[in-house]
């Protein structure tokens, strides 16, 4: 594993407290509000013209939950993140044509949301461990692109 035993403990302990639906919905909504041009990937989810449309779109919140649940799988596979995400990498590259830069952007937003939802637990050490995790997940999801 690329993570120390201490980093693994910090990641697993915080992740046990995460409300995936709430944090996932917040993370994807934030991404589409901060980077509105990313909304083109979700046009089939209905009207997303305004920030309020994004915030109140159930399909966006539901997909955010799905994305964060998938991210949570990395927590269970810290020793083989790349292997675990091989299929999703291929899918996002071949079918969805998602720019791999999005994985890094969303990873950074997930960090912000975790910090907002868990301010007492989100210590500097926990932040560092999760930053490392999102880097590894983004690299794994980008593997098919190289």
Curated annotation (Swiss-Prot):
Expression across tissues: Red blood cells.
GO BP terms, alphabetized: hydrogen peroxide catabolic process
Globin domain residues: 2-146
Keyword terms of this UniProt record: Heme, Iron, Metal-binding, Oxygen transport, Transport
Gene Ontology, cellular component aspect: blood microparticle; haptoglobin-hemoglobin complex; hemoglobin complex
Protein residues bound to heme b: 63, 92
InterPro entries found in the cross-reference section: Globin (IPR000971), Globin-like_sf (IPR009050), Globin/Proto (IPR012292), Hemoglobin_b (IPR002337), Hemoglobin_oxygen_transport (IPR050056)
GO terms assigned for molecular function: haptoglobin binding; heme binding; metal ion binding; organic acid binding; oxygen binding; oxygen carrier activity; peroxidase activity
Subunit comment: Heterotetramer of two alpha chains and two beta chains.
Family: Belongs to the globin family.
Entry function: Involved in oxygen transport from the lung to the various peripheral tissues.
Name under which the protein is recorded: Hemoglobin subunit beta
Naturally occurring in which organism (per UniProt): Caiman crocodilus (Spectacled caiman)
